[in-house]
Amino acid sequence: FIHQYDFSVEQRLDDFLSEVTMRGVALDSSAVFTFCLNPGLTVRSVDSDGQPLKFKRDKQIVLVDFGTNLAKGDTASVTFKYDGQIDNSFCYLDIPPEVLQASKKKFLFNIDKQYCFQTKDYLLLTPETYWYPRAGTGYSDENPDWQQTYFSNYHLKVKPLAGLVPLSQGEGKSDEHGVYTFKGDFPSQTISLAIGDYQQKSISADSILYSIWHLKGHDFFSAALDSIHDTI
């Protein structure tokens, strides 16, 4: 299982470039280990401690050959470099097609379904897209073991397009080069990444800072809160 992820993500006009280093423990003895990554993303290289590793790609499955047998309980690290666009058809394979394709209506409007967004103005990557490599096969209709859940530590660096702000789990900080870092206080199962023209509104109470981020032009709530400002 993976106990540590170190990411770097660069947003581009219509896709993204990423490098992810994973550190983990072998749950079984083997030389070849299985990872899952969205099939729309192209793996450029895989290495371990600077040494290139052979790998085979079959849609979402990436088989990585470490070149030597790792015993159960051994620790190892592996780095993926990849880029591209998310393939939405891979999302929610565990949900029956008739449920996914069922019409959703609100009054006269058909509500479309979109699992991620990749444009020059907005990026949204949720865990269901498998936008970063994860150990195992992802969904399987033959073995329920794919549903195993592990908690990992995440450290994320993001370089957004000019004028945009990234958001993810953990406290975010930016440097003079416009690179943002996020690091959670506790391990989590998965993480998401959103990048857009976000604006922050904050209030401090009892030494705790509460913040809301909204897209520019989407502040539909501040005026309604004026009358209770002293209460909240």
Identify the residue ranges that each predicted region occupies.
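N-terminal, polar/Ser/Thr-rich
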Residues: 1-17, 44, 49, 116, ...
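Intrinsic-disorder/low-complexity, polar/charged segments enriched in Ser/Thr/Lys/Arg/Asp/Glu/Gln
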Residues: 4, 15-21, 30-32, 61, ...
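Beta-strand-rich interaction surfaces with strong enrichment in secreted/lumenal proteins
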Residues: 7-9, 22, 51-54, 65-70, ...
